[in-house]
Amino acid sequence: MPKYYKRKYYRGNRDKYSVEQTAGTLATDALGDGGTTVVVPTTVQGMRKVKHLTISMAQNTSGTGLFWALVYVPQGTTVNKLNVDEGNMYEPNQFVMSCGIFDVDAGPMRITSPVSRNLNSGDSIALVLHSNTPSTSFSYVVRYAVTLQ
């Protein structure tokens, strides 16, 4: 009978992820623009990895559709407004992680981003909105996994 040798497999240490959850309310301004910081910047040195980003959102008032974008914001830059009239929806477009349209009549919205992002200290992720109805209010819950690398 042949001998079978059991191979030893080496597995490195896995990163320990922390699941963060936040909730809040945001409102659009008189022009219909609004937004919030979903993953806040930190002063801790080192790189953070953010993945499995999920946002649940419901509109508190009746109105029309909503344009949204989930945007990576590097340190030293500011969040721009959405351009829904013509051209690219968000500039610079290489920072857009996910985008779409929210139909109010369809019920609550759930945004899931399959993109994981490495964040340096000072970097953040923001949710940018544009509503055709000004002064609209939204409730949201954000959930994501983060680790320090």
Where are the regions a protein language model picked out?
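Short low-polarity hydrophobic stretches
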Residues: 1, 53-55, 125
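N-terminal leader/pro-regions and domain N-caps
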Residues: 1-33
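C-terminal interaction-tip segments
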Residues: 11-16, 118-149
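Extended, solvent-exposed segments with strong compositional bias
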Residues: 17, 77-119, 138
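Extended hydrophobic/Leu-rich segments
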Residues: 26, 55, 73, 79-84, ...
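Tight coil/turn sites that cap or link beta-strands
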Residues: 31-34, 122-124
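Beta-rich globular "head" domains
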Residues: 33-74, 143
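Short, solvent-exposed secondary-structure capping/transition elements
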Residues: 61-66, 79-80, 137-139
